[in-house]
Amino acid sequence: MASQQDSTPGEKRRRSLELRMALVCYGGVSLAVYMHGVSREVLALVRASKTVKDQITGRSDSPSQYIYETLLETIHDSVDLRVVVDIIAGASAGGINGIMLSRALAFDLPLESHRKLWLELGDVTELLDPKGKARAWSKPFMRPMLSFVGWWQRKSLGQVASDAARSLEVRQKLSLLTRSRWFQPPFSGERMTRMMLDGLASMGPDPQSPSSLMPAGHALDLFVTNTDFWGHRQLLSLHDPPVIVEREHRHILSFRHLQTADGRIASQMTEADVPALAFAARATSSFPGAFPPFQIGEMDAVLKARGKAWPQRQTFINRSFQALLAQGEDIADAAFIDGSVLMNKPLALAIKAVQNRSANREVDRRIVYIDPNP
């Protein structure tokens, strides 16, 4: 039942409302930059809601957050509105940005540094594996073919494509990519893993005092899809034969953050969990043919080269790979590819999670499906 603010006779009673959003982030090649922009707007809205609710003074440095604050203040006399994002499910590019947004919501951390991550580090020349990167005379027969393609684009396609074809940068990077290693993934898996670790680290450490954009007692659940290349055995009940054995390749990595009413934090999104979050980001975005399949040994090697520890490694394995462990499989042999291969739009995960939420005031529940259309 909706709770109402006390009011004197004759005054209009202020409505108390919680807008809860479950985000479903679509997976697709090259959508990471667009998803990042959406994530920043969602973070600005949630932060503006907390600012108005808690009557925090001072203008925000974010122009969009200031606009959201102004809007919420305008309606505050009639509606005491709190915006909460409590469920995020994502695949591939959506999975990466869902991970980053979840940690930002859990500990009230910034996402501004990720602009550089996507615009500068998310570059063909940066992602190419140095071992297979084209040299000056690699595949020289490709050069006249690329020149012909550029001429055809300028002649046959629209203005936007024509402008892109004339771009020296586009032509140089296309040449570099097509002349690099064939018949093996051209991009470096370890480079991508380092990017994910750097992206999470650039958000900053956990705050010394509890600080979160989640209301006390309200959990934030994150679901990231990936594809287990080898899969695990499972029984399927039929009529004749009564039971068959098949292999399940869909795999979900889940994380939860909860701050109790007395201030204690039970979170799987802390600074100590960064390697596990980076694991999920690398696995869900391991696009077949572009990146090599991801294995836990790759994460171990990158962390070792950096002199970093992973204290929660075994805890993460025990929690996330129960089916493999129950069948005696070695997690080191498991290989993961892009979550979009089998579960590109994880709406079912968000809908199922919504069913277990409680409320102590009026709630307007929305499931928001994010599919950028560049």
For the regions a language model picked out, list residue spans one by one:
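Catalytic or ion-translocation cores adjacent to nucleophile or general acid/base/metal-coordination motifs
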Residues: 111-129, 345, 352, 359-374
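Flexible, membrane-associating and regulatory peripheral segments of lipid-active enzymes
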Residues: 1-23, 44, 86, 138-146
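Patatin-like phospholipase
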Residues: 32-199, 236-248
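Active-site gating loop/helix substructures
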Residues: 170-183, 217-359
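A short, charged/proline- and glycine-enriched loop
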Residues: 15-21, 82-84, 219, 330, ...
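Active-site-adjacent bridging/hinge elements
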Residues: 7-18, 64-77, 165-170, 306-329
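Extended, Lys/Arg-enriched charged tracts that mediate electrostatic binding to polyanionic substrates
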Residues: 187-214, 218-221, 229-231, 343-345
